[in-house]
Amino acid sequence: LNHIKRVEKIIDNVLNKLESDEEFIYKEKIACILHDTGAVLGKENHAYRSYLFAKDYFINNDIKFDDINLILDAIKNHSDGFETDNLYGIILIFADKLDMTKERLSYYGKKVKGNKEYSHVNDIDITIENNNLKINFITDGEVNLKEINEYYFTKKIFKGVESFSNKLDLKYILLMDNKEWKI
């Protein structure tokens, strides 16, 4: 639940900075709330299970709105759909991948090489001005850059930022403690 709240906060922050309309933000938050419901049975194939849950939920509760299929597609493809043309999808991917701070890590996650380096990330600052996106990972100064850069999920974070930026025609830079971060 905390992950969902943090992803929702990123979505709200970013979409307000982009001056998105309230209806779009509302629908994006629906995708956010439902995107990991399938993870209760494990991470493997959780995006597809989340999609099935959301689809059944909408049908069983007679929830209908235009672009509901785009919301369902965003949920279904949020794990690896980096090449999507679905704006809901790319925003969900972006926000979901960016939620990698010490708050997200489980006890066991802190023991995994590479992943444990995110336990040193205290916050993420996102700035959007004049078509420039700046993402600054604020740490306690103890991050092992070699380990974090080699970790598979770091590549997903960078890919999510790149895809989001390309879709919205933004120039982007990732920073760690105000220094450019490249992998």
Over which residues does each language-model region extend?
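Divalent metal-dependent catalytic cores for phosphoryl transfer on phosphate-bearing substrates
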Residues: 3, 16-128
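N-terminal low-complexity or amphipathic/hydrophobic leaders
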Residues: 6, 10-14
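Residue-level marker of positions within ordered structural domains that often coincide
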Residues: 12, 80, 166
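Terminal helices and disordered tails flanking the catalytic cores of nucleotide-processing hydrolases
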Residues: 99-183
